[in-house]
A protein has these predicted regions:
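Short amphipathic helix-loop junctions that connect adjacent transmembrane helices
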Residues: 24-37, 222-238
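Helix-breaking motifs and short loop linkers at transmembrane-helix boundaries and internal kinks
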Residues: 34, 66, 87-92, 233, ...
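Helix-to-loop junctions at the C-terminal end of transmembrane segments
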Residues: 55-66, 253-267, 351
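Structural signature of the two symmetry-related core transmembrane helices
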Residues: 69-84, 269-284
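Cytoplasmic helix-loop-helix junction between adjacent transmembrane helices
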Residues: 97-136
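Intracellular juxtamembrane helix-capping segments at the cytosolic ends
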Residues: 107-119, 307-320
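Helix-loop-helix hairpin linking two adjacent transmembrane segments in secondary transporters
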Residues: 131-173
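Juxtamembrane intracellular "pre-TM" segments in multi-pass secondary transporters
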Residues: 177-209
Length: 389
């Protein structure tokens, strides 16, 4: 890999380790403040709603001022939010901390735009596969550390996440080279840009697919801790180890399989296969009460997420021009945040009122519908020419 790729990979990896520490812990931590499943869903949703507001703005700013300063700002906001979480004395402070993180949460969107700047049509899927591998590694190391530190206290993993995110911020400040120049920066409302991009036929359906996938994924991600706690009596430590194992499977899929599969099937068919695999994993989990079977169902789940994430991101990136990657990724990030706002409330609400199996089953059905929509999407490289006009 080139130096910019190495640094952006390490920056995002370290940041995602911090994020991976928080995810399995947050539901258990929130319950110590008296949070119900619905309140936990709203806690996850508050982050995504704040990100929904901020993501297009940060994407536009990254086009105007450069990727690196926006990435540093986002990482700094994450550090502040983790400190607030660790020092919280009430559920209200937990909500405030997640909102702060969401408003400054442009790190992944900016990283996608950064990779879009340096990618070519030939290596785009492979480079986004590496970003996916960073996700996978982050979700091996992060949840594993969360499980280890949870033996000490619920706040110990949060302090560890804050320290790790400081390391990511320092990497971005001192070693990450810039990819765009502050030229031809037009002051366009990010929401106007979102409407304009959504008006393109090649992006409108793709944005809908993107939204539905991330809403379904948010159901899985934000209900997993309560799912395994209710069905298999897991605690925060065991949930962290479970997510670490799932992350390990994801690394294998995204680092070793995505490139060859995309080369053979193309991005669209890889995405369709991923949606079906994920539906099998989540739908099967909804039906089983056997822990060994649940473990086996992690395999199609990991294949699904491993195929979907890089192929979907690559399709979105390929549908926008090189000079507008910040706007495209910011708009996509806004819709993904909308999905991650609705998904936790949907998933945790259904879990509280109808049971954890119904929550997972509903997400699996939406994934199958999304696969059907994906079959109607026509990949067109003319979008680059359209964007240049």
């Amino acid at each position: 890999m080139t130096r910019p790729l190495v640094i952006i990979f390490l920056t995002i990896l370290v940041n995602l380790i911090g994020f991976g520490i928080i995810i399995p812990l947050l539901p258990f931590y929130a319950q110590t403040f008296g949070a119900s499943p619905v309140a936990i869903g709203l806690l996850f949703a508050s982050f995504s709603l704040a990100q929904l507001i901020a993501a297009p703005v940060l994407g536009h700013w990254s086009d105007r001022w450069g990727r690196r300063p926006i990435l540093v700002f986002s990482l700094a906001g994450t550090v502040v939010s983790f400190v607030m979480l660790a020092l919280a004395k009430s559920l209200a402070v937990l909500f405030l901390a997640r909102i702060v993180d969401g408003l400054s949460g442009g790190n992944i969107t900016t990283a996608r735009a950064y990779i879009g700047d340096i990618a070519t049509p030939e290596n785009r899927a492979r480079l986004f596969g590496l970003l996916g591998a960073a996700f996978g590694l982050g979700f091996i190391i992060g949840p594993g550390l969360s499980g280890v530190f949870a033996h000490i206290s619920y706040t110990a993993p949060i302090w560890a996440a804050a320290a790790i995110t400081v390391v990511a911020m320092l990497l971005a400040i001192f070693w990450l080279p810039e990819t765009v120049h502050r030229v031809d920066a037009v002051s366009v409302s990010p929401w106007t840009a979102l409407r304009e991009l959504g008006g393109r036929p090649n992006l409108r359906l793709l944005f809908l697919i993107d939204f539905l996938y991330w809403a379904s994924f948010a159901v899985y991600q934000t209900t997993l801790a309560l799912f395994v706690a209710r069905r298999f009596n897991f605690d925060a430590t065991h949930t962290g180890y479970l997510l670490a194992a799932f992350g390990f499977l994801g690394v294998i899929v995204q680092a070793a399989l995505v490139g060859p599969i995309v080369k053979r099937l193309g991005e669209k068919r890889t995405l369709m296969a991923g949606l079906v695999f994920a539906a099998i994993g989540w739908g099967g989990s909804a039906l089983t009460h056997s822990l060994p079977v649940f473990y086996l169902l992690l395999v199609p789940g990991a294949l699904g997420i491993g195929f979907c994430n890089p192929s979907l991101v690559s399709l979105v990136s390929g549908a926008g021009g090189r000079h507008e990657q910040g706007r495209v990724q910011g708009a996509a990030g806004a819709l993904e945040s909308l999905g991650r706002t609705i998904g936790p409330v949907w998933g945790n609400g259904v879990l509280q009122w109808a049971g954890e199996g119904v929550a997972y089953g509903s997400a699996a059905l939406v994934l199958l519908g999304t696969a059907a929509l994906t079959s109607r999407y026509h990949v067109s490289r003319r979008s680059h020419a359209e964007a240049a006009e």
